[in-house]
Amino acid sequence: MNILYFYQYFTTPKGSYGTRVYEFTKRWYEKGHHVTVITGVYAKSDIRADKFIENQEFNGVNVKIINISIDNRKSTLRRIWSFFQYMLVSCWYALTLKADVVISSSGPLTVGLPGLVARYLRGRKFIFEIRDLWPEVAIELGIIHNRLLIKAAYWFEKKCYKASTHIIALSPGMKADIENRFGYSNITSVTNSANIDLFGTLVKEPDLKGLIPMTYAIYNGNIG
């Protein structure tokens, strides 16, 4: 199966951001799927590019990097401009790249547009993944003030949910919020997890045969 994943914040474990998409896509590839991630250049990620569009590969996963800087330290207008640049280029990929399933990971909410393009113009299955509840987050953070923009953002949010083949929420609370507001049942909560292989292997317990009945004193250091 060909999976096309729109996610602006892709990073590997070398970066200082969540590796959920890195871990998931790596496992999908290992199961025989062809995976392409469309990402930007996030300040906390280790992903960097020299050209405007650059192809890199990680564990068999094709990562197309749109060399658009995303940094929370930038002004609100510059961040919004970065979101729209990524959205426009991603829509081109939604129209042209081979895909059976398209995943848009929000926020920002603008990442939903390439998913809608693939859904309505190409008839592809569209998975809308919710990491943050936009536009609520943007409103609370003061990114969106204008009433007309707020109304448009809520309309677009509803459109993305309605068009989705399935909705993925990263927490049970998000799932409940979407269900309560829209009444959709095609939603699953898939929480973040940890790759326990990164923490090493279990240490084999020592063989105590021959130590008993001798008496041993053990100093464990100062406690308290």
Each model region followed by its residue ranges:
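N-terminal subdomain of nucleotide-sugar transferases
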Residues: 1-61, 187
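Conserved donor-binding/catalytic core segment of Leloir-type glycosyltransferases
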Residues: 4, 208-224
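Carbohydrate-associated surface elements
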Residues: 41, 173, 190-193
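A short, charged, and often flexible helix/loop element on the N-terminal side
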Residues: 61-88, 142-145
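Nucleotide-sugar donor phosphate/pyrophosphate-binding loop at the beta->alpha transition
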Residues: 82, 122-127, 136-159
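Acidic anion/phosphate-binding donor-loop and adjacent secondary structure
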Residues: 194-209
